[in-house]
């Protein structure tokens, strides 16, 4: 239920009440012009009605009848009305509706106008609005890396996919990517890696590079910095990602960051490392090391597996104050030049659990061991002992290091949390292909995983997994009785609500890995001028998985496979390293590569012998998964109701036997006995009731029941000057016990007399003549049912 103040609670409990509402369109209060309003919410699913609380999506609808103010409403608000008045109800306009009693209201609806209809000659305009689902009408697309197949380990979960689809629609559950869009200006900020860690290592931008074993970690919600966090089960959990842009090290400001909860730990250290690909197969790095026990923060610049220089700071608060910290570091390499060794100034960035930003003086690396030769970002490594959420790396994050503000670090005013998730369930090795809108994809996931998706009255998206309805609550959110609250009540029980044999299909990915697809070799040597960017689109097949940017080859250590070489001349020249940023992204059937030259001279995509050097090597899976099924059943229920089967539709979202078992058992637990549905429950209007609430229904007049039920549908209507009417659809939290049939002897399904009638040939064999039959004195009924065998 929604929270409310004592005054509203008292108003709703009083014998008499005065209805109240407030309605804003486009931020303008129009409640006084509302002739009537109606709000409807219900779970939508393809399951039997009595089971519909267990999966599907809920999209709320608001209908308003709007009158004019001094002039007819159509003149003000029709599609052809002047923009000065008509825009307040145009399609896409914001709508906020509140309802209550005695002047106190709570949120009832938040969404956008979908349509307006003006009846000419009347004083009424009908406005229909939908909730936040309208914000998710953009095309759905999920990143599909090959690494889950490569390691045979889950790369994401259904929860992660929902969170990613929400993010695409601008609905966030944690700080968003700082600069997700590809800008024409190569000097603009750009997010090269963003991993929410909301139930998966898959990343919105970039790709996983290595995956830990599932036994080494868990996904937690309690104590997560924002929503869901990666929690190691032992110290030193390692995971790494590939950026979507291999940016050059010199001449810019870039940063890496994450959020942690130091109160949830299995050790006291964390390392976040940016690895850069140098020439001749060597690698350099900038690494942030945090020691929570001592409050020491170190930043290292050096060579992977070799020497380097370490800068150190001490923050006593880091050791003394446990909780959610925002940690990271900024690297300023503007003093370096493309093609030369690069010095850097580094800045640790910390925000404490109390919201205080901890400033620190920069440290400048000038020692020879700390200078970075020409190179490009290759990999991002994380090693952690604490709970981690929302990791991202931003190229060109700020013009300089010194003017960077605490508000910019915290992205203040740039995002609002608009989603609440559930436990990360339904692991995925290979992300299914999605189609349609983001809302369509979320609905598909909800139905496939017995989850629910909805926007509440405040416009917050809520995702609840299959465990939501499996435990009966101890006490209700509200009690309604026929003595005071209930005006009408219909209780129904149907055999269609009984499902005592539940079967779930799943995909078996055992033995399936990834392999190279058909190599695509460029046909043109491309010139990239200084300061310019060149984009090239290469066709990829629908069944091919996502790949990262090509690796950058140099002449000292030639490579094969997915790569590109930049030459100093169109005929080949010498290889150029650390001068060109290479990024990639997938857009439907196209794999788009972007080259940006940061040097002072043109370079060409050319091999040493003068041929085009861009070589794209797509990835695909080695085969298709096998379809298998898992079923749970209940023989006691089958004895009373017969076998009632539910076969879940085959879906790509169930990829483990255990998940299939969990889902089929959840459905069996919900439907092994038909649970009563309380339909058309007309109650006194209570604006606090929400979908999923538990209501205690006490009927002392008709059905004589006292039971708990979940709210799975709400319809509220109100006309000006009248009391609101609220109708609930409820699903019982449990069934009314196992049938006992006391004192009953149920008739068998087949008439016992069928097949017992004697045939003519049998009667003829027992009576030689008609006279013998007549003399026997047997009646006709006795003749047909007598002993001597059954009918043929």
Label the model's feature ranges.
Residues 658-672:
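Stable alpha-helical structural segments in soluble proteins, enriched in small hydrophobic residues
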Residues 1-9, 20-22, 120-151, 283, ...:
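Acidic, low-complexity/disordered segments
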Residues 413-431:
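Short, conserved helix/loop micro-motifs enriched in His/Cys and acidic residues
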Residues 3-17, 175-218, 223, 247, ...:
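Surface-exposed fibrous attachment elements
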Residues 446-447, 451-479:
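Extended amphipathic alpha-helical segments with heptad-repeat/coiled-coil character used for oligomerization
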Residues 1-401, 425, 429-435, 439-450, ...:
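Assembly/oligomerization scaffold segments
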Residues 161-165, 402-416:
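Short, charged, amphipathic alpha-helices and their helix-cap/turn boundaries
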């Amino acid at each position: 239920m929604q929270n409310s103040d004592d005054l509203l609670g008292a108003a709703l409990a009083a014998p008499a009440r005065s209805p109240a509402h407030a309605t804003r369109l486009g931020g303008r209060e129009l409640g006084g012009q509302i002739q009537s309003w109606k709000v409807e919410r219900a779970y939508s699913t393809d399951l039997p009605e009595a089971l519909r609380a267990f999966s599907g999506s809920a999209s709320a609808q608001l209908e308003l009848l709007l009158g004019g103010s001094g002039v007819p409403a159509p003149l003000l608000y029709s599609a052809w009305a002047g923009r000065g008045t008509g825009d307040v109800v145009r399609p896409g306009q914001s709508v906020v509706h509140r309802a209550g009693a005695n002047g106190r209201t709570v949120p009832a609806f938040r969404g956008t106008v979908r349509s307006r209809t003006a009846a000419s000659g009347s004083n009424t305009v009908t406005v229909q609005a939908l909730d936040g689902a309208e914000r998710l009408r953009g095309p759905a697309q999920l990143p599909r890396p090959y690494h889950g197949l490569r390691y045979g380990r889950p790369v994401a979960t259904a929860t992660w996919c929902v969170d990613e689809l929400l993010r695409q629609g601008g609905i966030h559950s944690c700080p968003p990517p700082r600069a997700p869009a590809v800008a024409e200006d190569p000097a603009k900020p750009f997010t090269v890696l963003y991993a929410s860690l909301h139930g998966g290592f898959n990343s919105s931008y970039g790709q996983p590079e290595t995956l830990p074993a599932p036994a080494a970690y868990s996904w937690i919600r309690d104590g997560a910095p924002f929503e869901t966090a990666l929690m190691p089960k032992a110290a030193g959990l390692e995971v790494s990602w590939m950026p979507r842009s291999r940016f050059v090290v010199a001449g810019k400001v870039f940063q890496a960051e994450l959020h942690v909860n130091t109160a949830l730990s299995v050790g006291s250290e964390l390392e976040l490392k940016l690895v850069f690909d140098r020439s001749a197969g060597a690698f350099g790095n900038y690494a942030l090391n945090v020691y929570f026990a001592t409050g020491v923060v170190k930043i290292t610049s050096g060579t992977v597996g070799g020497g380097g220089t370490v800068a150190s700071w001490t923050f006593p608060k880091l050791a003394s104050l446990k909780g959610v910290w925002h940690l990271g570091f900024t690297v300023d390499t503007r003093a370096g030049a493309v093609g030369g060794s690069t010095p850097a100034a580094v800045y640790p960035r910390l925000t404490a659990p109390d919201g205080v930003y901890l400033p620190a003086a920069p440290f400048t690396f000038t020692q020879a061991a700390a200078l970075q030769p020409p190179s490009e970002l290759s990999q991002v490594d994380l090693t952690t002992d604490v709970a981690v959420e929302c990791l991202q790396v931003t190229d060109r994050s700020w013009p300089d290091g010194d003017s960077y503000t605490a508000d910019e670090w915290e992205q203040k005013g740039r995002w609002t949390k608009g989603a609440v998730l559930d436990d990360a369930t339904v692991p995925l090795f290979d992300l299914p292909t999605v189609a349609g809108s983001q809302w369509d994809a979320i609905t598909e996931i909800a139905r496939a995983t017995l989850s629910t998706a909805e926007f509440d009255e405040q416009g917050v998206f809520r995702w609840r997994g299959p465990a939501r309805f499996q435990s009966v609550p101890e006490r209700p959110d509200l009690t309604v009785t026929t003595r005071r609250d209930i005006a009408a009540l219909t209780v129904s029980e149907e055999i269609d609500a009984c499902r005592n044999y539940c079967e779930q299909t799943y995909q078996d990915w055992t033995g399936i890995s990834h392999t190279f697809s058909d190599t695509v070799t460029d046909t043109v040597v491309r010139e990239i001028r200084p300061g310019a960017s060149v984009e090239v689109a290469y066709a990829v097949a629908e069944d091919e998985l996502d790949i990262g940017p090509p690796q950058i080859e140099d002449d000292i250590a030639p490579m094969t496979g997915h790569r590109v070489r930049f030459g100093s001349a169109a005929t080949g020249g010498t290889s150029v390293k650390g001068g060109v940023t290479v990024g990639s992204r997938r857009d439907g059937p196209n794999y788009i590569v972007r080259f940006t030259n940061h040097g002072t001279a043109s370079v060409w995509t050319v091999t040493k012998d003068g041929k085009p050097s861009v070589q794209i090597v797509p990835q695909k899976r080695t085969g298709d998964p096998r379809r298998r099924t898992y079923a749970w059943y209940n023989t006691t229920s089958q004895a009373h109701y017969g076998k009632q089967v539910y076969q879940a539709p085959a879906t790509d979202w169930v990829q483990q036997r255990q998940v299939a078992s969990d889902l089929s058992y959840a459905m069996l637990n919900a439907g092994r006995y038909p649970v009563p549905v309380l339909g058309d429950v007309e109650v006194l209007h209570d604006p606090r009731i929400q979908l999923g609430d538990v209501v205690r229904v006490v009927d002392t007049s008709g059905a004589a029941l006292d039971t708990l039920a979940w709210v799975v549908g709400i319809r509220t209507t109100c006309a000006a000057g009248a009391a609101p009417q609220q109708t609930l659809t409820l699903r019982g939290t449990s069934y009314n016990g196992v049938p006992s049939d006391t004192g009953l002897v149920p008739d068998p399904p087949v008439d016992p007399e069928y097949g017992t009638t004697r045939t003519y040939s049998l009667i003829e064999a027992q009576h030689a003549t008609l006279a013998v039959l007549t003399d026997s004195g047997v009646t006709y009924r006795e003749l047909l049912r007598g002993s001597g065998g059954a009918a043929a």
